[in-house]
């Protein structure tokens, strides 16, 4: 089985850390890059986090974004140039920003969900 190469943004945040742990346990995934808004001088599972860039996302099949709206649009611009799939878990977008994400989704595959926490998903499943 071919692995899915992941780039995980916001790697120092709570969701970023959880994604890293989960992806490392699952043989279907390989983390090709981790990004953060500032330089980090430590390795996480052998990977040194980078700043969002074309080089950081080149090897990924999918970019997973759990950052802030400003960073999400940086990421979407790069993903568009590279024709990468994006999963957006970031929240707090304005209506104008939501429309812009919709425009990007006409060009590249985007999965956007405002809340991917276990508790919310369990609640949605039970109702």
Predicted regions and their residues:
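Short glycine-/small-residue-rich Rossmann-like dinucleotide-binding loops
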Residues: 67-68
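N-terminal Rossmann NAD(P)H-binding glycine-rich loop of SDR-like oxidoreductase domains
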Residues: 8-20
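Extreme N-terminal starter segment of soluble prokaryotic enzymes
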Residues: 2-6
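NAD(P)-binding Rossmann-fold cofactor-contacting core
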Residues: 22-46
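Rossmann-fold NAD(P)-binding glycine/threonine-rich loop
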Residues: 76-77, 81-82, 89-113, 118-127
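N-terminal Rossmann-like NAD(P) cofactor-binding module of classical short-chain dehydrogenase/reductase
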Residues: 63-64
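Short acidic low-complexity segments
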Residues: 30, 46-60
